[in-house]
Structure formats: C-alpha cells, structure tokens
Amino acid sequence: MNTLDFDKRPEDTRIVVAMSGGVDSSVVAGILKREGYDVLGITLQLYDHGAAVHRAGSCCAGQDIDDARRVCETLGIPHYVLDYEARFRETVINPFAEAYAMGETPIPCVACNQTVKFADLLATAQELGADALATGHYIRSRPNPVSGQPGRRALYRPIDSDRDQSWFLFATTQEQIDYLRFPLGGLSKAETRALAEEMGLVVAKKADSQDICFVPQGKYTDIINKLKPNAALAGDIVHLDGRVLGRHDGIVHYTIGQRRGIGVATGEPLYVVHLDARGRRVIVGPREALETRRVYLRDMNWLGDGALAADAGQGFTCFAKVRSTRPPTEAVLHADENGIYVDLMTGEAGVAPGQACVLYSAPGPDARVYGGGFIDRSERSVDAEASLKALLEKPVAA
C-alpha cells in the first residue's frame, strides 16, 4: 500500500488537489508531489466581485487563483482553473441569504463542500482519471475494516484540535469519504507552515482567511440585503415576558445568543433567544433562557457502522458539538417516532437553527466522526419554552 492506501506505486496513482491558493492546500500538493504521485492542481473560481477579488486569503478569487498558479509552477505540476461562479451563487450564496431571511444562521462552508467541492470538483477529478481528490482540510480518514467493504473509510478528528475542521465536514457522504484524502490530518498548522517554507512556496507566510470567503470585510449583511431586502425590514425587539423594548433594523443583524449590539438598554443583561422571521421580531431574554438540552435535526448524515434506526433506536451514546468553537460534550442520539434528536447532557447556550450538531466517539483528538445534521429547532427549559410559545402565538401588531 502507498501512503494514500492504494495498492500501487505513487507514480501510478493520480491525485487531484483542490487548491484554494492558501498554504494548506499548497502544502498538500507539495507533499504528494514529493512522495512521487501524479498530481494535478485545480482551483475553482467561485466569485468575482469588488474587494474580495483583490483581498489575499479570501479563497478562490483573483489573488488566490494567482497564488495557486505560482505554487503549481514551483512544484512543477499542471494547474487548471474552473469557472463555477454561477453554480456557487445558486447553491451557496442564494441559500445563505435565504436562511438568514428565515431567522437561521447558515454554514456556507458546508453547502460549498457538498454542492461544489465534494460534488462537482469530485466528479471532475473522476473524469480526469484520478484515484482520489485531496484537500487541505484538517481532518483524518482511515480504512474502516469493520464495514467489511473494500475501500470503505471512516473520518476522525485531526491531531491539531485548534485547526479541527470536522464540524464543517459532517455532511460528507460515505461515497465521498471513500474517494477523498486529507494529508494534513496528522500535522499541526505550525508543521504545515514549516513545510511550505522548506518547499519554497510563495504562500508560506500567507495569512489564513478569517471571514466567509465571499463576504468582503465580514459584512455579510450587505449581500443579504441585496438578495433578500425583506430581511432588513424593521420590527420590534420583544422580551420573553411580552414587553416591547425597542425597534430593530432587520433580523439579519442578529443571531441566537448575541448579547452585544442588541439596541436596548434595560439595566439587565439580555440575549437574543429567538428570531421570529414571520413577525419580524427579535426576542430577547436572560441567559438562562438560552440553555438548550435537546436539538432536533434535519438532513441527517449518519456515518456509523450500522443503520441509523438500529444504532440510535434505543439511544446512541456519543459526544456532540453544536457550535464550531465549542468542544464536544456528552450526548445521546435518538431516532424514533419523534424524529431525529440529540439530548445534551450539559446544557449549551447560543444554539441556533441552521447550525450543525456533529457527533463523535470521544471528546478529544482522533475521535471518530459519526456525522450529524442541521439544527432544525431546539428545546430549552420548560419556562423558557412556555414563554416563547405564548409569545409566538400572540398576534403581531400591524
């Protein structure tokens, strides 16, 4: 077996590398080239507007495409650029705006992976005769002998917990996992940068992207207001107890768990606990009203060894992560007549519809990823649920 688990020599193994123009995917290409694989670099042009084109680290725009080209020249591998702007707008940007308009907090990186990178680009790699598509994500995959199927693989958290991207990859299907390779899963970010320096790559000191790639300067509201003007319509800021505390300029400016910048001063700390898109209301309350013990999931992607109904029918003990910045905590997954839901042993605050609940075998590095789903709704304390229900059933004043 070679280092990518193929039973043939590296030089007889063709690998397409998804190159964003950043240091991570560039080092992946360098590692595979150094190991003797037949490497092709492909960059997707996903958008081309305003400041994002000239902003280094924005991913898959003008400057980054040029950086990917220069890296491929240094490594001596072919580089291709594919125009996916229309596809990206249709499957990522438009749904992103629609979700915010409905009071959700979407994860565009997941949509991009599932509709562009791990669907369209993966299909292109197969058409080019590649044995695998490699990316610069910090996650691991290994053969899964328990499955009893040749070529079947499982996902695991990476060694570098600070760079763990497994939460964003929960929706990766089993067929995609079997075809993908993640060479950086066993490296730290510092080791990746050291390799980039050693290889003489122009991106060795390039800063990491911190924003949503298609949102210049982090101003996501500009895009949403352009595509979904109704999301910027004014409405009331309402306390859970029914008091109208003030006005807002659009629910798009708020997210569940937010405390700062709410726009009201009452002498008590208040948090956004619900966004009522239909009534154009931002509902606020005390921090204890945020504590969530159960989340209901939609679009579940189960990556366990058995069928979901069999594994979770009587409750499946695992660890759940409901926010990208939070560690996994003890949980139980259920799949029964009430739907698919996760009971959290420790209450979590700031759980928002549209975000993900991702399941693991353990809380630490190298834990297996069991998949997950998008959060459809959540249950809080009995008092908070009752207050919210009563408020939502109350007619909104014209």
UniProtKB/Swiss-Prot annotation:
The name this protein goes by in its record: tRNA-specific 2-thiouridylase MnmA
Protein's organism: Agrobacterium fabrum (strain C58 / ATCC 33970)
Catalysed reactions, as listed in the record: S-sulfanyl-L-cysteinyl-[protein] + uridine(34) in tRNA + AH2 + ATP = 2-thiouridine(34) in tRNA + L-cysteinyl-[protein] + A + AMP + diphosphate + H(+)
Family: Belongs to the MnmA/TRMU family.
Pfam families per the UniProt record, alphabetical: tRNA_Me_trans, tRNA_Me_trans_C, tRNA_Me_trans_M
Keyword Disulfide bond applies: yes
GO biological process: tRNA wobble position uridine thiolation
Site, as annotated: Interaction with tRNA: H137, Q355
Tagged with keyword Transferase: yes
S-S bonds: C112-C213
